[in-house]
Amino acid sequence: MNKETRFPEHFDIPLFLKNLPNLPGVYRFFNESGNVLYVGKAVNLKRRVSGYFQKNDHSPRIALMVKQVHHIETTITRSESEALILENNFIKALSPKYNILFRDDKSYPYLMLSGHQYPQMAYYRGTLKKPNQYFGPYPNSNAVRDSIQVLQKVFMLRTCEDSVFEHRDRPCLLYQIKRCTAPCVGHISEEDYRDSVREAATFLNGKTDELTRTLQHKMQTAAANLQFEEAARYRDQIQALGIMQSNQFIDSKNPNNPNDIDLLALAVSDGLVCVHWVSIRGGRHVGDKSFFPDTKNDPEPNGQDYAEAFVAQHYLGKSKPDIIISNFPVPDALKEALEGEHGKQMQFVTKTIGERKVRLKMAEQNAQMAIAQRRLQQSSQQHRIDELAKILGMDSDGLNRLECFDISHTQGEATIASCVVYDEQNIQPSQYRRYNITTAKPGDDYAAMREVLTRRYGKMQEAEANGETVKWPDAVLIDGGKGQIGVAVSVWEELGLHIPLVGIAKGPERKAGMEELILPFTGEVFRLPPNSPALHLLQTVRDESHRFAITGHRKKRDKARVTSSLSDIPGVGSKRRQALLTRFGGLRGVIAASREDLEKVEGISKALAETIYNHLH
C-alpha cells in the first residue's frame, strides 16, 4: 500500500531530505503557490531527490525548476515499475510545468466489428466492450476510414447503424455499387454473412495467406458446381487481397504469423524533439503520426529522456503491441511495467535487419522531415504573430494566447456562444468551450455576448482570487461589429480587465479579405491587405470560432426540436420518447415508421402507435 509524505507548513528541505527513505517511490516538487512543478520516480527516493539539491550539473530545464521548489511530496511504492506507473498517472493528471508532456487529447480510434447478429463494421473510439471485436489502435481517424473502404470492397460488410439496418425495406446505394451484401433485406444468409465477417477478421489479424487459400478453395468449389458468378466474386476478392498484400510489412523474423508492431523513431534537432510512431497491425501498415513535446523550458533537450517519456505516456494504461522496434533503448523498469499490464512478454528491439531495418530507417527520415516542417510552420506562425503584435502595439513576446468569441442561433432559437483558443502557435481544441446562453432574450446578440464574457472572465477572476493558476489571454477577438465590441468594452470596465480587444467585422461587402478591424481602446477602424499575415491569423481563429459555435447550436437546436415534436404527443413521456428515438435512430426514423413498426416498440400500444403516427403525419 502506498504511503504518503506531505510537507509541514514551514517546509525545511534539508531536514526533509535527511529523513527520506532508501525506497522506491514517486516525488512531486511544488512552488510557493502550491502548483506542481515536476513529478519523478526513483528506485531510491533519498538518493534521487537529494541529488537535485546537491549537484550542479543539471540541464537548463531542471536547473530552472530546482530554483522554484518550495516543498516536496513523496509516495512510497513497492517497486520501481509500480513507481513508474504512478508517476505516469500523476503526470497525466497534473500536467506539471517541467515534465516532458506529449499532449494527445483523444483516445486512439479502432476498427470495430460489432457483436450484432449481422455485425456492423465501424469506426470506434472509446472503452472497448464485449462482444464486439476491435482492431487497432490506429494513429488517426483517416487510417480507420481508409481501412473500412478497403474492406468494403473485398468483404462487403454493412456499415449502417443498427437502427437503420433494422428498418430498411430495400437495399441502399452501397448494395448497388457492390460495397455491401444487403443483409438488411435478406440478400445474404446469416451463415454466409458471418463467413464474410470471419474472413475480414482473419485479414485484419494479418493471416492473409490463410484467407487466400480459403477463398481459392471456395472459388474452385463454386466453379466445379457451375456457380460461375459466385466463383467470379471469389476471384475478385483474391485479386484485391493480392494488391493489398503487396503493400504489407513482411516481418522477416516471423513472416507467416504477423505480429502487432510499433516502430518508434526519435529525432532531435535545434531544440526540437520528435517521436515518429508507425503502427503495423496484422502485417499492415495502418498509419503513422509524429509527436512533438513542449520543449520551450528546455533549450538543450536530452533525446533519451523524451523517448522514455513518450513510451510511458503512450503505452501505460493503453493498448500495446507485441513488438516495439525503436532507435533508442527502453529502460528495464519500463519494460517490466508494460509487460505487467500487457499480461504477456513483449519484444523490445533496437538492433534490426531486413524489412525491420528498412522500416525503422524510413521512420527516422519521417521524424527528421517532421522537425523540418515544424520549424517552417513555427516560422510562418511567428511571422503572423509578429505582424499582429505590431498592429496591437504589443511586444511579440507578450502575444501568445488569443481567445475568440462568437454567438450562433436560428432566429433566437438555441443560442450558443463559443470560445476558441489559439496558443503555442496553434489552435487548442481541448481548451475550447461552449456556453448555453440563459439570461439573454432570444435573438439579442449583444446580451448574449455580455453573458459569455462576464461568465468566462468573472469565473477566471474568482479562480485566481482563490489561488488557482489561470491562463489569461494576451488578446481577445470578438466576431462582430461595433455593437458587440462595445459590449466587450463595457464588460472589461465592469471587471477591471486590461486585455487588448479586437473586433473583426465582415464589412459592407461581407467578403473574405475585406474585413474591418476595430480596436476600441484606440478608436481605430481599418482594413488590412488581403495578403496580410496578421489578417490570416485573425481569419483562422475567427472562422474556427464560427464553426465551433454553429455546430454546437445545431446540435442543441435539433435536440430541442426532436424533444419538442415527440413531447407534444399525448401519452409519450421521456422513457417512451427515448425508446422511440433509440429504436428508429432519430426523429426522421420515427416519422418514416409505419403504425406496425411503432407498435413493436416496448411500451407503445396499438392505440398509442395510431396517435403517434397521426400526430407526425
Swiss-Prot record:
Describe its function. The UvrABC repair system catalyzes the recognition and processing of DNA lesions. UvrC both incises the 5' and 3' sides of the lesion. The N-terminal half is responsible for the 3' incision and the C-terminal half is responsible for the 5' incision.
Q: Which processes are annotated in GO (biological process)?
A: DNA damage response; nucleotide-excision repair; SOS response
* Species this protein is from: Neisseria meningitidis serogroup B (strain ATCC BAA-335 / MC58)
Read off the SUPFAM superfamilies from this record. C-terminal UvrC-binding domain of UvrB, GIY-YIG endonuclease, RuvA domain 2-like
Q: Which Pfam families does the UniProt entry name for this protein?
A: GIY-YIG (PF01541), HHH_5 (PF14520), UVR (PF02151), UvrC_RNaseH (PF22920), UvrC_RNaseH_dom (PF08459)
Q: How does it assemble?
A: Interacts with UvrB in an incision complex.
Q: Which residues are connected by disulfide bridges in this protein?
A: none
Q: Which family, according to the similarity comment?
A: Belongs to the UvrC family.
Asked if the Swiss-Prot or TrEMBL record annotates the protein with the keyword Hydrolase, the reply is no
Q: Which UniProt keywords apply?
A: Cytoplasm, DNA damage, DNA excision, DNA repair, Excision nuclease, SOS response
Question: Per the record, what is one GO cellular component?
Answer: excinuclease repair complex
Which cell locations does it reside in?
A: Cytoplasm
What HAMAP family does this protein's entry cite? UvrC
Q: Where is the UVR domain?
A: 209-244
| UniProt keyword Cytoplasm present | yes
**GIY-YIG domain location:** 22-100
Q: Which Gene3D superfamilies match?
A: 5' to 3' exonuclease, C-terminal subdomain, GIY-YIG endonuclease, UVR domain, UvrC, RNAse H endonuclease domain
Query: What gene makes this protein?
Result: uvrC
Give this protein's Gene Ontology molecular function annotations. Answer: DNA binding; excinuclease ABC activity
Q: What is this protein called?
A: UvrABC system protein C
